[in-house]
Amino acid sequence: MKVVKINAIWCSGCLVMNKVWKNILKRYDIETINFDYDLDEVEVKKYNVGDILPVFIFYKNNEEVFRVVGEKSESELVKIIEEIGE
């Protein structure tokens, strides 16, 4: 599984989710590619991301299988990861 994570330094929800994601990575082996909404503008545009951050785009076998927008609980993300499968 691979996750593209898009956030911004001005986004308070992103700061919260960074901590949540770090906890998840302690439990799961997930390749994570991080983009900054402002600094990586060209890359971010490829993912059709709106104004609500953070965005987590889950890939399995190089296909997008799920997208999470905004703050979610750790348990919600774990449920998604378990459903997709590593």
Label for each model-derived stretch:
Residues 1-2, 40, 61:
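Preference for well-ordered, secondary-structure-rich cores of eukaryotic proteins
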Residues 47-57:
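Structural micro-motif
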Residues 58-86:
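Non-catalytic, surface beta->alpha helical segment in thiol-disulfide oxidoreductase systems
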Residues 5-7, 25, 29-42:
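Thiol-based oxidoreductase modules, predominantly thioredoxin-like and allied folds used
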Residues 19, 46-47:
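Chalcogenol-based redox active-site neighborhoods
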Residues 12, 39, 72-75:
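Short alpha-helical
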Residues 1-26:
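Local sequence-structure signature of Cys/Sec-based thiol-disulfide redox active-site neighborhoods
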